[in-house]
Every structure is written in structure tokens, then in C-alpha cells.
Amino acid sequence: MGESPKLEASGFDLLAAGWEIRAARALLWPNLTGSATGEGFSGESTGKFGIVNTTSPSGGGVNTSRNVDFAGIGLFGGKLIYPVFKDGSIFGFNDAPAVEIKRAQKDALEWTTHLTREDVIYRVTEVFIDTVSAQNRVEPIDRRLALLERSVDIHKEEQQKGLLLPADVEVVTKQLGSARSLSTIIHQQADAGYLGLLRLLGLQSSDHIRLNNTLPGPPSPPDAAQLFHTMLARHPSLLVQLANVNKAKQDYRLENYRLYPSVALHGSGLYVTDFDTDAHDLVGGVTVSIPIWDFGAQLNTVRARRDTYAAEQARLGAVGNDLASDLVKAYREIYETSESILRHEGEAGKLDRDLRVAQSQQQQGIAPPLTAIDAELALVSKQEELAIERARLLLRYAELQKAMGGTWKWIP
């Protein structure tokens, strides 16, 4: 499972969500920035009062001391902003909505990872069961092909003797062509499933890998009441939706707090030098930002988030209903497949008895060879159907585990 790209991606998503929580929390703490600027200039003052010399006898004139050939200065500054009360945060010490939103997103991702893991397990299980089932059906299908080839030869001999019509030969010849196509397909299915399973398991080479051709037996059906009342309450899909409800709640809180004034402490310092003389100033203060009028934009945003919160709460019940429906469907399909297996087993038993009788009659010279061949063809076909149904039953239990999100496990 550790080689699954899906699970690897989910792991990185969780790491990213953790960093987003830290980033959201850091935005609530003091923010300090600094700047350094170097400037050079030459020329004269452009203000009309800056260039007039009022001390001259005539009361006016150009002040030549305002001319500068070239000068350079350095400016160094720093700015500190500390949000005291903003978007529900009080000095960054409480559970602010902005942080809780990111935490809810991470919770949803964690439970989604559980669902992803079950999806990967189901995919591997499905390919394994299909592949082993296909490999186990190769020999019976090849046996059916050999029987049909013998049947075609016998039909042709019987036709030459005038005992059968050409239409009879044509029918069995078409069956032989279909059987050959089916034999090719089942071999390709087995090969494709084997290679696909290696890829899903993250294995590069198939030289030293041998697939066990024995399928496990089906488990006992789990207690439905326990699944409904105990395990269903801990289903990852429900917990994902609970995280979505919490996220919607925090979104609502965040937008609601934005209706209130915000308070921030700020301070700045500036140091200026022309590399001969220096100057500096320091500024500190408190800024209170009060929302006065925005034509109802923020209030309507709050209402939208409130209704979204209510929708997510209602959706929680819908998720529970969907899970209950999936569980009922899984039990129904398990029953239908089990009933089909029971029916096929009974029919296979009768066909096996018919084959033994036909073979015995053929040995005694009572029945023609085609009777035994047809009886064996019917038995092989029924055994193939039975093998398909048994593999399908295993898939039904794998689907049940997937539907339960891993709260009930057949495959660890």
C-alpha cells in the first residue's frame, strides 16, 4: 500500500494542510518588516518659496544655497504591526476562526485518506480476484475447446454417413469458433490482470513473482445491527462531513467577526543619513478600524455563510442515509450471489451425474460418443459459471469493506 501513488499524494496533502495551519496562526502574531533605501539626487528645490531669498535688500531673489550638485542619502526603516483584535483573534492566543478553518480542512483530509486507502485495497483485491479467477478458468475453457473440436470431427463423420444435417455441423462449427475466441480472451485477461497487479503493488519485475492461484473462502456475514449502530457511527465519510460542518461553522464565525471593529498596534522607525549628519523618528500608535457602511455586502456574506453552515449540517444526515442505503444494497447483493452459487452447485451436481451416466452408457455401447461430449460440455460450462459466481461473492465482501470505509475488515 505504501507504493500507491494515491496514498502518497494523500500524505503530501496532509503535510501541506499542516503547514497551512501554521501559516494561518503566524498571521495572527506581530509582523515586522524592514527596509533600506539609497537615493542620490542633484538640482535645486522646485518649490517657489524654497528658492526665494527673503533676506535680500530688495526683498526677493534666487537663493543659490538651495542648489545641489549631487547628494546621496540612506533611509533605513522598520515597521511593526500587531493585530490585537481582528477576525475573532485576540492577540493570537485564542482559537481564531482562520486557524480553525485550516484545522477542519486537515481533519477532512485525514479521514479522506482512510477512504482512499480502502479504495486502493479494493482495487488491488478486485484485480487479484479477477486475475486468479481468470487463471483458474483457463484450463476448463481449453478443455471445452478440445471437446468442441472432437464434437466437430464427429459431426462431420456423422454427416458424411447421412446421420446428421449440414446445419448441425454448421451450428457446432460456430460454437467452436466462439470457444477459440473465448480461449484467447481468457488467456489475455489472465496476462493483463497479472501485469496490472504487479503495477498496483509497485513491483517492477515479474520474473520472480508467482501468483497464488487459490482464492480465499468468503468470510461469515458480519452482524448487520453492529454495523448499523456501532461501526456506522465511526464511518470515515461521516467524519469527513463532520469536518466540513466544522469548516462551514468557522467560515460563518470569521465573516461574522468582520462586522466588528478591529484593533491593531503599530509602530515604525525611520533613520535617515547623508553620511555626514543623521536624523531619525519613532512612531507608535493604536489603529481602530470600524466598518461603517458597505451597502450590506458584509452582512449578506455573513448570511450566506450561515446558510452554508446549515446546509452542511443537513448534508451530514444525507451522508448517513447514503451509507445505510449502501449497506442494505451490499447485503442484498451478497445474498443474491450466495443464492446463485447454491443454485449453480445443485445444477453442477446433476450435470456431473448425467456425465457419469453418459460415459457409462458409452462404454457399454448404449449411447453414442456425442452424448458424453455434450454432457461434459454442459458440466464444464456450469463449472465455469460457478467459478465466476464464487469470485463475484468475494468481490461482494470486498465491496462491503469498502462501503464501510474500513470500519469492518475482511482484508487487513
Model-derived segments and spans:
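Periplasmic alpha-helical coiled-coil/stalk elements that build and connect Gram-negative outer-membrane
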Residues: 113, 117-230, 330-333, 337, ...
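Short segments within alpha-helical structural elements
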Residues: 16, 26, 178-205, 346-406
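Small/polar, glycine/serine/threonine/aspartate-rich low-complexity segments that form flexible
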Residues: 35-94, 210-224, 253, 266-303, ...
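A glycine-/polar-enriched beta->alpha junction
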Residues: 2-8, 15-30, 65-70, 78-100, ...
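Transmembrane beta-barrel architecture of outer-membrane proteins
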Residues: 73-75, 126, 171, 281-283, ...
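Amphipathic alpha-helical coiled-coil scaffold segments and their short linker/junction regions
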Residues: 1-3, 53-61, 168-169, 173, ...
